[in-house]
């Protein structure tokens, strides 16, 4: 049915031929062609009630949305605009962009942050105040967070945000309102998020059905056929976060480096104690204590079970202060720092004070030592992602930075009042090479909504639970024209994943999380392909054989058809002759996978999904006694 969708897209574009490509307020900006295209379609089809902007970080989805909001009155007189956003993103980018390019809509805007404990009450209170003659346009920024907060908990409890989700899914189309969802990573943790998002945009279209069988989509064609026009898809980098990507005129080159570091004996000792503590307390599935132990360890492991919280907190504070005091008036000499900046380690002729300090710091954290050495050897500015703030996280890392003489800013929950200004200073043209501020260390607070310019190295100290979060992190530094001020030879970003290892070869929590991420991505890649093939851009570019229409009366019927996956049309069982193989998508063998090569030369993954044909002259490497095909 994509031909039918193409006819409506064509109709919308014909209706909006004269829509200006510039947006003017106190400043003027000219929209990119892809921004103007999606705005014209969404505004040109009044009965297109909802749309997902699946745009990668840095391509201007906020700007696109503000342009749409500015032109809502081209199709109806009275609008109330409700923006559901994270609190940290209200001022920048949303308010700043609106005031700069569309100040006239400010009076119509209602901002509600969905991470507020009273979000549900505030939302419905505001809904009641809206004039009945007004149409509503709802914007959900970083909609994957909103969806996550709307999922029913494993224990069956319904989250407060779910009532807002239900209201929007029932009301938007019924009352002729409009809704735009924005995300660079619309699916983060589970396939259920895809179902939730689809039913928010197209209510009732995807009932409780199993989307996958043996990790393969049951009927991709049915999904694509029924969900045409669901989204706008602007994703220039479709590679895995673990793949290298060549640079272009607008985007910096990305190179991924896996930095494996062997934990010190002290760290291994504390790591094993952390593992036992997780088992005793029943939190081993979260791996929090082990993740912290791979990052930094005090001289002892503070037990938390069956203890007064105040007493436990006091012990942590004492351990922190003891470590901080041990570094008082200590720092590396200029000679040592010059050695580190060359990418070298201390030699035998180094001072006893430098060697002693380095040894003490490494015993407690090989990761922090590795990061500091990497930063000093970097030719430009650096980002460091550390999800933990207190105890063994950023608070400790900053002590290491001080000893190594690394200038820095912090973007975390501890710096809410100063972090936006600090990032602005970090991004200044005068700091392009990191002369004033070398590094920004950020927690999960910095994973969304902010931009960094002229970054050359990103160090990821702790694996997240999903690839989407890693994309958000890396996407902060590789954005459209983010390196325009950087010298041509430094328009690159090295992404360093720092992975801790045990001396006995057993997998660590870092390696466990790496495997979890790869397992999830197999299903997500297929769902992202559905988004791509149902997008306005894909349909407009690939469906040309349609009969033009002169009204939009059939759009609602077209997009209201239920999806039926019961027939499982594309699931076929077939026995194929061939041989088992090992393959990797990286020349550096960052991940090695089991696969299968049929006698016809077709290559499949371990679940039977076709990957591609075997090249005539494949690249093969030998690793641990295995022949590894490089694809």
From Swiss-Prot:
Q: What does this protein do?
A: DNA-dependent ATPase that acts as a 5' to 3' translocase on single-stranded DNA and thereby plays a role in transcription termination of viral early genes. Uses forward translocation in concert with the viral RNA polymerase RAP94/OPG109 subunit and the capping enzyme/VTF to catalyze release of UUUUUNU-containing nascent RNA from the elongation complex. In addition, acts as a positive elongation factor to assist transcription through problematic sequences.
Name-wise, this protein is: Nucleoside triphosphatase I
Provide the top EC class: hydrolase
Q: Which gene encodes it?
A: OPG123
Q: How does it assemble?
A: Monomer. Interacts (via C-terminus) with RAP94/OPG109 (via N-terminus). Interacts with the cap-specific mRNA (nucleoside-2'-O-)-methyltransferase OPG102.
Q: Where is this motif: DEXH box?
A: 141-144
Family matches, as SUPFAM superfamilies: P-loop containing nucleoside triphosphate hydrolases
Which PROSITE patterns would you find in this protein's record?
A: HELICASE_ATP_BIND_1, HELICASE_CTER
The region called Binding to the cap-specific mRNA (nucleoside-2'-O-)-methyltransferase is annotated at: 457-524
The UniProt entry, under Pfam families, shows: Helicase_C, NPHI_C, SNF2-rel_dom
């Amino acid at each position: 049915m994509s031909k039918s969708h193409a006819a409506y897209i064509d109709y919308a574009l014909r209706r909006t031929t004269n829509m200006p490509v510039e947006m003017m307020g106190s400043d003027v900006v000219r929209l990119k062609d892809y921004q103007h295209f999606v705005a014209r379609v969404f505004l040109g089809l009044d009965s297109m009630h909802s749309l997902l902007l699946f745009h990668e970080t840095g391509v201007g989805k906020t700007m696109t949305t503000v342009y749409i909001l500015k032109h809502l009155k081209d199709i109806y007189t009275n609008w109330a605009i409700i923006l559901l956003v994270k609190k940290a993103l209200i001022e920048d980018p949303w308010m700043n962009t609106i005031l700069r390019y569309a100040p006239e809509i400010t009076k119509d805007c209602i901002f509600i942050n969905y991470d507020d404990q009273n979000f549900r009450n505030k939302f419905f209170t505001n809904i009641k105040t809206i004039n009945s003659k007004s149409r509503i346009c709802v914007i959900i920024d970083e909609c994957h967070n909103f969806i996550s907060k709307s999922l029913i908990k494993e224990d069956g409890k319904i989250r407060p945000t779910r009532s807002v989700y239900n209201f929007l899914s029932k009301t938007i189309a019924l009352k002729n309102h409009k809704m735009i969802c924005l995300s660079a990573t619309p699916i983060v943790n589970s396939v259920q998020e895809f179902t939730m998002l689809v039913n928010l945009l197209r209510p009732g279209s995807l009932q409780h059905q199993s989307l996958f069988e043996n990790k393969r989509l049951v009927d991709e064609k049915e999904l694509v056929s029924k969900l045409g026009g669901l989204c706008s898809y602007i994703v220039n980098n479709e590679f895995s976060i673990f793949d290298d990507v060549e640079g272009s005129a607008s985007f910096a080159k990305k190179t991924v480096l896996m930095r494996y570091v062997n934990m010190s004996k002290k760290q291994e000792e504390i790591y094993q104690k952390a593992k036992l503590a997780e088992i005793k307390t029943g939190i081993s599935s979260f791996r929090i204590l082990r993740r912290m132990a791979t990052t930094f360890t005090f001289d002892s492991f503070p037990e938390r079970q069956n203890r007064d919280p105040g007493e436990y907190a006091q012990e942590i504070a004492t351990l922190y202060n003891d470590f901080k005091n041990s570094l008082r008036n200590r720092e590396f000499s200029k000679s040592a720092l010059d050695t580190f900046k060359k990418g070298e380690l201390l030699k035998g002729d180094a001072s006893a004070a430098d060697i002693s300090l380095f040894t003490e710091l490494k015993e407690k954290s090989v990761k922090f030592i590795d990061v500091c050495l990497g930063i000093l050897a970097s030719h430009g500015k650096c980002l460091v992602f550390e999800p933990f703030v207190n105890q063994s996280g950023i608070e400790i890392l900053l002590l290491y930075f001080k000893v190594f003489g690394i200038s820095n800013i912090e973007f975390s929950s501890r710096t809410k009042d100063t972090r936006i200004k600090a990032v602005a200073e970090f991004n200044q043209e005068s700091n392009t090479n990191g002369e004033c501020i070398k590094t920004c260390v950020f927690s999960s607070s910095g994973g969304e909504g902010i931009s960094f310019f002229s970054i050359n190295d990103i160090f990821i100290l702790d694996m997240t639970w999903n690839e989407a979060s890693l994309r958000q992190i890396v996407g902060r530094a590789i954005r459209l024209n983010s390196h325009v001020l950087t010298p041509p030879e430094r328009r690159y970003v090295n992404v360093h994943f720092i992975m801790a290892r045990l001396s006995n070869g057993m997998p660590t929590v870092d390696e466990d999380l790496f495997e979890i991420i790869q397992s999830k991505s197999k299903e997500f890649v297929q769902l992202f392909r559905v988004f791509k093939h149902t997008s306005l851009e894909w349909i407009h570019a690939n469906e040309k054989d349609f009969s033009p229409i002169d009204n939009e009366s059939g759009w609602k019927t077209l997009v209201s058809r239920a999806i039926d996956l019961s027939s499982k049309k594309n699931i076929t069982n077939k026995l194929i002759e061939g041989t088992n193989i090992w393959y990797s998508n990286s020349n550096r063998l960052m991940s090695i996978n089991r696969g299968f090569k049929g006698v016809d030369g077709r290559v499949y993954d371990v679940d039977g999904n076709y990957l591609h044909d075997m090249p005539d002259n494949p690249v093969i490497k030998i690793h641990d006694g295995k022949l590894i095909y490089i694809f």
